[in-house]
């Protein structure tokens, strides 16, 4: 791993009402979880000087509602890829609405996922 790589993290929300992190590196801008409405996530991004249009993807840690509430809306509206493991996809898929297959990205637990 490159020891000189830098990234910035902003906690947008944390708690039972919703969770979301914004992570930015030199190459990518990722939303980790979107547990609030798409509108609220957009507002929180704007508070840190960012917009959903700048995002490259959404990474979902698990399928609980306080982590996925805005995932489907944001992915559809901004054509964002969604990354989740197979079990999370199975549980989350019927809850987030229709997302184009090409935006559904799977990863294996324990494997390194490089952005």
What is each residue range found by the language model?
Residues 38-88, 103:
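Active-site metal-binding motif and surrounding structural segment of the metallo-beta-lactamase
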Residues 5, 78, 100:
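Residue-level signal for beta-strand positions within conserved beta-sheet cores that form or flank
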Residues 26, 75-76, 97:
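Short glycine-enriched loop/turn motifs at secondary-structure junctions
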Residues 86-115:
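Metallo-beta-lactamase
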Residues 1-48:
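Conserved beta-strand hairpin/beta-sheet module of binuclear metal-dependent hydrolase folds
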Residues 10-20, 57-67, 93, 110:
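Structured catalytic core of nucleotide-sugar glycosyltransferases
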């Amino acid at each position: 791993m490159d020891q000189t790589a830098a990234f910035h993290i902003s906690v947008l929300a944390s708690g039972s009402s919703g969770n979301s992190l914004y992570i930015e590196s030199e190459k990518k801008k990722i939303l980790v979880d979107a547990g609030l409405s798409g509108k609220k996530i957009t507002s929180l991004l704007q508070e840190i000087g960012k917009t959903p249009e700048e995002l490259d993807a959404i990474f979902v840690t698990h399928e609980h509602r306080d982590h996925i509430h805005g995932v489907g809306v944001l992915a559809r509206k901004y054509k964002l890829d969604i990354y989740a493991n197979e079990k999370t996809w199975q549980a989350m898929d019927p809850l987030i609405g229709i997302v184009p297959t090409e935006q559904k990205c799977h990863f294996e637990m324990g494997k390194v996922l490089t952005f």
